[in-house]
């Protein structure tokens, strides 16, 4: 008889308790292959895709999320929020859920919208790909075909996208992402027009049932640096940290030693009971560990962020933030050190929000200092002869002078908090549209099917061609689901739209085939591109997966426990058997 370690891999010990008897049994880690593996993976992916895809399009349904034992249920229409809440008991099925969930999460990280589209695309590619893998197609070649086809589609999206040139387009993009709410679309367009493209747009929970827009000039800053450690997060569902009325420590040096933090962190801030935001070149080793421990213990509500930029640009940007917040940059060049910091040298803000991708600072007051700084930057722009330097100065000026728009979200009940999620999607979609332009809405990808098919047949062979055709079939999945969510069959409508101009799509709200640009149904090109890229990436990864190793959550009977213990420790065999029969009687 061969040992389990030879047959099944590494053994694992688990302790079982029976009355006052503790027994250790040996169980193996489960390893599934081929049909079993793919079947369980598919079931998990099917469950997630169905739960998320019902929300797609203007006729999409809502999903109710349980909020635990005490909170009210939450009604949402946001794909990534739904995906994060799904956990299955079966480990293999849950792995399938987690894999498809990545497509939504990555799209949300990059574009802030399009998570449901990414999920539908990824699911369609995986389902079609698995059929071919089961028919002995080479998964690596299929992966290459998927990647090449995806690059072709992305190049087509870039070619057909239109730049956003007016407020009307911004309003339309925001309205579509907010669930066809034109009032919200207009509000976001007004906010961008007032604060500029580099300005800050922030969301707050309102105190009434009405959603309001509050504008201030020169009081906000967004830096593209997020928290150094996820242990600083205060809201694990949204993976963000929000601080009200925090102090802000600004320094251009690395913080490596605990001794550098003691004066400001433990002696000054802890006595005020106010939060602390640290913006430094970096926070390393024991200093970071100290901050995290004190955060978790509730001694100081702190979050650390790396300073933006490099070299002299970093110093000037830190000085800009210092002027905005009324603080000073702790720099050795200015004769300051962390050991000698006083409370009046720290900046202050009304609120800060830190996520993985960036930090939003909303300050109050200091308008005169900010205006003076803006004038100084304008003079530097006039004097500069370098186009690169002028561009960077313009960015700084836009950030300082752009201002802040605060949208106070009103909701009648806790259950209607979905409104805030839709507003977030709308803001992110609008910013994405400004960056990379717009394309027609209503699942534009369907128009690339014919071009992709011609390109693939001319450039690819064998299993690579199969990979490209998998992408081709998946391109119709978003439109198919949008139409099905209206309650009608999709096949006839899809065939009608395929051969028409790029701007023609299906207006699911009215049930008509129309020009999407003319009726204002448009999507950001960045959102469509990100959804396509991430769906293809996840699908390729799943199709090249050969096996999964998971823990089998399987209880072991007392007889089995003793049996394996007898095999591994014969000296205690007799005593344990006597005890077993005694307990059994």
Curated annotation (Swiss-Prot):
Its EC number is 5.6.1.7. It comes from Pyrenomonas salina. It catalyses: ATP + H2O + a folded polypeptide = ADP + phosphate + an unfolded polypeptide. Keywords: ATP-binding, Chaperone, Chloroplast, Isomerase, Nucleotide-binding, Plastid. SUPFAM superfamilies: Ferredoxin thioredoxin reductase (FTR), catalytic beta chain, GroEL apical domain-like, GroEL equatorial domain-like, GroEL-intermediate domain like. Together with its co-chaperonin GroES, plays an essential role in assisting protein folding. The GroEL-GroES system forms a nano-cage that allows encapsulation of the non-native substrate proteins and provides a physical environment optimized to promote and accelerate protein folding. ATP binds at residues 55-58, 113-117, 442, 507-509, 523. This is Chaperonin GroEL, chloroplastic. Belongs to the chaperonin (HSP60) family. It comes from the Eukaryota.
């Amino acid at each position: 008889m061969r040992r389990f370690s030879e047959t099944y891999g590494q053994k694992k010990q688990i302790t079982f308790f029976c009355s006052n008897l503790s027994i250790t049994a040996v169980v193996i880690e489960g390893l599934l292959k081929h049909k079993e593996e793919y079947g369980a993976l598919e079931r998990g992916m099917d469950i997630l895709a169905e739960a998320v895809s019902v929300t797609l399009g203007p006729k999409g349904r809502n999903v109710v999320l349980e909020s635990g034992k005490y909170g009210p249920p939450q009604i949402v229409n946001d794909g990534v929020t739904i995906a994060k809440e799904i956990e299955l008991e079966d480990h293999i099925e849950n792995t399938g859920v987690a894999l498809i969930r990545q497509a939504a999460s990555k799209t949300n990280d990059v574009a802030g919208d399009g998570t449901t589209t990414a999920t539908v695309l990824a699911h369609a590619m995986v389902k079609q790909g698995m059929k071919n893998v089961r028919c002995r197609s080479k998964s690596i070649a299929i992966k290459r075909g998927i990647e090449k086809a995806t690059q072709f589609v992305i190049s087509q999206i870039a070619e057909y996208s239109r730049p956003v040139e007016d407020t009307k387009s911004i309003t339309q993009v925001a309205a579509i992402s907010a669930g066809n709410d034109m009032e919200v679309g207009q509000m976001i367009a007004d906010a961008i027009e007032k604060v500029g493209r580099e300005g800050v747009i922030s969301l707050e929970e309102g105190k009434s049932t009405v959603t309001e827009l509050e504008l201030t000039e020169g009081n906000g800053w967004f830096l593209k640096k997020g928290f150094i450690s996820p242990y600083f997060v205060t809201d694990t569902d949204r993976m963000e940290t929000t601080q009200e009325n925090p102090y802000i420590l600004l320094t251009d040096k690395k913080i490596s030693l605990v001794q550098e933090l003691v004066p400001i962190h433990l002696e000054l801030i802890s006595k005020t009971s106010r939060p602390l935001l640290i913006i430094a070149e970096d926070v390393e080793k024991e200093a970071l560990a100290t901050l995290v421990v004190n955060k978790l213990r509730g001694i100081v509500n702190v979050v650390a962020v790396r300073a933006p930029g490099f070299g002299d640009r970093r110093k000037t940007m830190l000085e800009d933030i210092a002027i905005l917040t009324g603080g000073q940059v702790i720099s050795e060049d200015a004769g300051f050190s962390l050991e000698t910091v006083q409370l009046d040298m720290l900046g202050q803000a009304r609120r800060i929000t830190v996520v993985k991708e960036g930090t939003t600072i909303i300050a109050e007051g200091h308008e005169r200092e900010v205006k003076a700084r803006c004038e100084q930057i304008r003079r530097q722009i006039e004097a500069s002869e370098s186009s690169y330097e002028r561009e960077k100065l313009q960015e700084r000026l836009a950030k300082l002078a752009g201002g802040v728009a605060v949208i106070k979200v009103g909701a009648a009940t806790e259950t209607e908090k979905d409104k805030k999620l839709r507003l977030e999607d709308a803001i992110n979609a609008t910013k994405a549209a400004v960056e990379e332009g717009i394309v027609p809405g209503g699942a534009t990808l369907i128009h690339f099917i014919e071009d992709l098919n011609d390109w693939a047949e001319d450039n690819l062979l064998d299993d690579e061609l199969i990979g490209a055709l998998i992408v081709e079939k998946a391109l119709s999945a978003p439109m198919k689901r949008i139409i099905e969510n209206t309650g009608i069959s999709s096949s006839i409508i899809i065939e009608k739209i395929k051969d028409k101009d790029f701007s023609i799509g299906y207006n699911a709200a009215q049930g008509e085939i129309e020009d999407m640009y003319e009726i204002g149904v448009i999507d950001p090109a960045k959102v469509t591109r990100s959804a396509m890229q991430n769906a293809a990436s996840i699908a390729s990864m799943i199709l090249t997966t050969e096996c999964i190793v998971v823990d089998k959550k399987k209880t072991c009977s007392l007889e089995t426990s003793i049996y394996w213990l007898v095999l591994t420790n014969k000296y205690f065999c007799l005593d344990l058997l006597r005890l077993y029969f005694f307990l059994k009687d």
